[in-house]
Amino acid sequence: MSFKFLIESLLLGSISGQIRCGRSSVIPRGDVSYGGDDTDELNMDIMLFAFGTLIVVYIVICIVYFFTKQIATRLITAYYNEHGPGQRISLFSDYDENNAHVHSRRLMENMSLRWPNNLDDADEVRDKLAQLSPEEQFYYKQGEEYIKQNPPFLLNQGLLQQSEDSNPDTTREDPIMNEQTRQYIQEEGAYAWEFSPNPDMPNHTVIVENKTEVSFLNYNYDASISTNLPIPCINKVYYCEFKIFETDGPLNSDENVSKGVISFGLSTQPYPYFRLPGRHHHSIAYDSNGARRFNDSFKLNEQLRTLFPQCEKGDIVGIGYRSRSGTVFFTRNGKKLNEKSVGGHIRGWKFQYLYPIIGSNVPCQIHVNFGTYGFVYIEANVKKWGYAKSNGIKLPPPSYEDYGKDTLLESGGEDNDFDEDFSDGDSDNIAAGSTTNLNDDIIIRNGEILPPPPGFEFTMSPPTGKKIINEEINLDSLPMLPPSYSDDEHHSKNDKSAISGRIIGTSRNLITDEASFDSVDNDNEDENDHERDPEQFSEFDDYESRMHGI
């Protein structure tokens, strides 16, 4: 009751002008008059005040609603343009790893909505499909079914942008161009890209040599092969060249103009390996017959069929991709091709992963350059549009062409050269019967003298304080007669063996001196023997007889 009285007092005081000089005069309840005129005046003022308040609130609500509607309309329109009208809008991430296959198929359908083509209109496809042969219809349906069963891996651009703006620790790693792949590209450079055939492809259809030399062995049926890595999409422009190195006859002859085709292009993966590029969704190609195909498997009009010049053996076709704008351009033999007659280059063709692809239905050999060596297109060399550096940071193998610059190999080369010179220089002398002294000084190429080879005189130190006598040991220094083993010559045998022991290894002078000395000793011994007692001889004879008996 007191709260109601306070409100009435404030209202009456404000209306009657009793609030003066910042002060409010509260009128007691008993002094308030509730006459009829005052009551009507009070109710009118309250109604006017309430009505004005409602108008102000309504205007504020209308303004908020208008701005909210505009913002929501723009957000929803942008979301539908990017994800399609069939997608559910959610404030949270609706990506489910368990439904990755369904998610990829939805993204593929959304990409088709962004770049409409002849394959998306069912009525138009039905009419054009009827114009194809039964075999072509079969392969077209097989290719479309292959893409439906194996949708290309596409990342949601909105999720990618969100992950870039969020905390780096919580970002989702790129499953293809991850840190390991980037490290591999940094080490290998442009050699990181190589063509890999599909495992389901028939044997001996495509042979890959040296990573980028592709040989097609198929005849009268389509086959295609793509690289193991996509375009990095880090730089602004990427460029590669395809050289028709070898063909099985002319490509554009009167008999082969409608059958033999080699296609060079870009596509998403996986792509039907039994179809040429440019025939199905998310692929573009330059055909060797001069046509440009962009998601079109049917008969082309005259402008697209003759847009580019025809290719033959030795021609070089280049494909450039601008990652910022999604523009694809083509070159032939170093000259950029004009596409204004069909509306210019294809623009806005942005994908997270695009792979270089080659297709053919005739035997041929194609060499591809991703930046390992110079391009024929000069602008690509100047602006360095290759997929990566030519060699990367990995050290190349040593070159064996100039082996003389290597220190180890140079020393080996000198030894070989000396051996050849020695054999060549001495061959004439050896044939003439001359001998070569091994103790002669050997002079090498640099003018240095090598030490003589080691001999027996250096195997042991010579005796000091004695005169060294050079002697020659041969068969003449040995005794001529064999030793006698008879009883009568027992003493002479012992003497000769002693003499022969002294002869071996001594000089001739020493031999003569010792021989004379031994003869004197023998004479003295004979005299002593005659002077000995006969009993001693008898004892000696008994001893010898016992020895013979034993």
UniProtKB/Swiss-Prot annotation:
Stretches assigned to the Cytoplasmic side: 1-45
Cellular localisation: Endosome membrane; Vacuole membrane
Domain of life: Eukaryota
Region entry Disordered, spans: 479-550
Modified residues (Phosphoserine): 519, 538
Record Gene3D superfamilies: 2.60.120.920
Keyword entries, A-Z: Endosome, Glycoprotein, Membrane, Phosphoprotein, Protein transport, Signal-anchor, Transmembrane, Transmembrane helix, Transport, Vacuole
Ranges of compositional bias, category Basic and acidic residues: 487-496
Known glycosylation sites: 110, 203, 210, 256, 295
InterPro entries linked: B30.2/SPRY, B30.2/SPRY_sf, ConA-like_dom_sf, SPRY_dom, SPRY_Ssh4-like, Ubq-SigPath_Reg
Main location: membrane
Residue ranges annotated as Lumenal topological domain: 67-550
Gene Ontology CC annotation, any one: vacuolar membrane
Annotated ranges, domain B30.2/SPRY: 172-375
UniProt GO BP: protein transport to vacuole involved in ubiquitin-dependent protein catabolic process via the multivesicular body sorting pathway
Gene Ontology MF annotations: ubiquitin-like ligase-substrate adaptor activity
Bilayer topology: Single-pass type II membrane protein
Cysteine-cysteine disulfides: none
Function text: Components of the endosome-vacuole trafficking pathway that regulates nutrient transport. May be involved in processes which determine whether plasma membrane proteins are degraded or routed to the plasma membrane.
Additional information: Present with 656 molecules/cell in log phase SD medium.
Similarity-based family: Belongs to the SSH4 family.
This protein's name: Protein EAR1
